[in-house]
Amino acid sequence: MKSKIIALGDSIIKGVILNIESNGKLHYALSDCNIVDQVANKTNHEVVNLGKMGCTIEAGERILDRHLAGIENAEYALLCYGGNDSDYNWRAIAQSPKGEHQPKTPISVFEKTYARIIDKVRQAGLTPIVMSMPAMDAERYYQFFTSVFSDEEKRNVSRWLKNGTDAIWAGHELYNDAIKRVAAATDAMLVDVSKAFSQPEKYLCVDGIHPSRAGQKTIASAIAHAIV
């Protein structure tokens, strides 16, 4: 009987990619070679993918709580959070750049909740595997999310950022560092997939944040190597 991996996280775990249609329109879809399925094939495990697009760490804890009773026969819990937690409501910033704007999950809440999730999966008998966020292309992401904004809204976002897209990258790295701190503090296995994205433009979709099929393959190989 194969061992089982429970995967919890956001759209990266879910396997979401951004496709470009023949007419140039963009749409999100599920990859036919997502990370979790590739890890299962490489390590001879069964998988239960509980990933959800847009999932923050607090929403992830609620999903885990609903499924705790059914995961006790699994071996690993693959965890991937941070991309949505570290992000902002860019539409709100575009419309009110002088207002108070914070990431979707305060970093202190993010760290405490992540540590609690790790403890819960351990209590259920699983080995937690904490995945860092892959590197992002901040400039590409900026161009993507502002593409639907008016010129005035784009100027508002640009003024709010002050340091340009470097500020987006810095926020991303702040939460990536938090992930590594939590993994170290809880003595959880860390798979730092950001190291595999030395040239993120080769491994990301046009939105600058979701791994392409090539990126998913790279991440899956890093995770499988850590498990085997």
Task: Please describe what each predicted stretch is.
Residues 1-51, 67-73, 77:
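Serine-esterase "nucleophile elbow" of acetyl-processing enzymes
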Residues 6, 12, 48-51, 57, ...:
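Generic detector of intrinsically disordered, low-complexity, polar/charged segments
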Residues 45-46, 51-56, 134, 197:
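Short, solvent-exposed turn/loop segments enriched in Gly/Ser/Thr/Pro and often Arg
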